[in-house]
Amino acid sequence: MKFFVFALVLALMISMISADSHEKRHHGYRRKFHEKHHSHREFPFYGDYGSNYLYDN
C-alpha cells in the first residue's frame, strides 16, 4: 500500500513538473481547471501531500 501511494505521488509530481511549461503559457488556467473538478477528498494528498492521509493508513 505504501508503495502504491508513493508511486501515485511520484506520478502526480512528474505530471505537475511537465505541466509547468504549459502553465506559463495558459497563465495558470490548467491548475484552476484541475482544482475546480477534483476535490481534496478525491485526492487527499494533493493539498499538503497527505500528512493526514499517509499516517492514517
UniProtKB/Swiss-Prot annotation:
Residues bearing Phosphoserine are 21
Superkingdom in the source lineage:
Eukaryota
Give start-end of the signal peptide: 1-19
What processes in GO biological process is this protein linked to? biomineral tissue development; defense response to bacterium; defense response to fungus; killing of cells of another organism; positive regulation of cell-cell adhesion; positive regulation of metabolic process; positive regulation of substrate adhesion-dependent cell spreading; positive regulation of vascular wound healing
Q: Which residues carry this modification: Sulfotyrosine?
A: 46, 49, 53, 55
Cofactor(s) named in the record:
Zn(2+); Cu(2+)
Q: Which InterPro entries match?
A: Histatin/statherin (IPR030773)
Q: What does the entry list under GO cellular component?
A: endoplasmic reticulum; endoplasmic reticulum membrane; extracellular region; mitochondrion
Q: Where is this region: Involved in wound healing?
A: 51-56
- Keywords in UniProt for this one? Antibiotic, Antimicrobial, Biomineralization, Endoplasmic reticulum, Fungicide, Membrane, Mitochondrion, Phosphoprotein, Secreted, Signal, Sulfation
Free-text function comment from the UniProt entry: Histatins (Hsts) are cationic and histidine-rich secreted peptides mainly synthesized by saliva glands of humans and higher primates. Hsts are considered to be major precursors of the protective proteinaceous structure on tooth surfaces (enamel pellicle). Hsts can be divided into two major groups according to their biological functions: antimicrobial Hsts (e.g. Hst 5/HTN3) and cell-activating Hsts (e.g. Hst 1/HTN1 and Hst 2/HTN1). Hst 1/HTN1 and Hst 2/HTN1 act in different cell types (epithelium, fibroblasts and endothelium) in oral and non-oral mucosa.
> What is stated about domains?
The wound healing domain in C-terminus may promote cell migration and proliferation.
Which family is it part of?
Answer: Belongs to the histatin/statherin family.
Other comment: The recommended nomenclature of salivary peptides follows published guidelines. In agreement with the authors, it has been decided to indicate the boundaries of the peptides according to the positions within the precursor, and not in the mature protein, as has formerly been proposed. Histatin 1, histatin 3 and histatin 5 constitute more than 80% of the total histatin concentration.
Name of this protein: Histatin-1
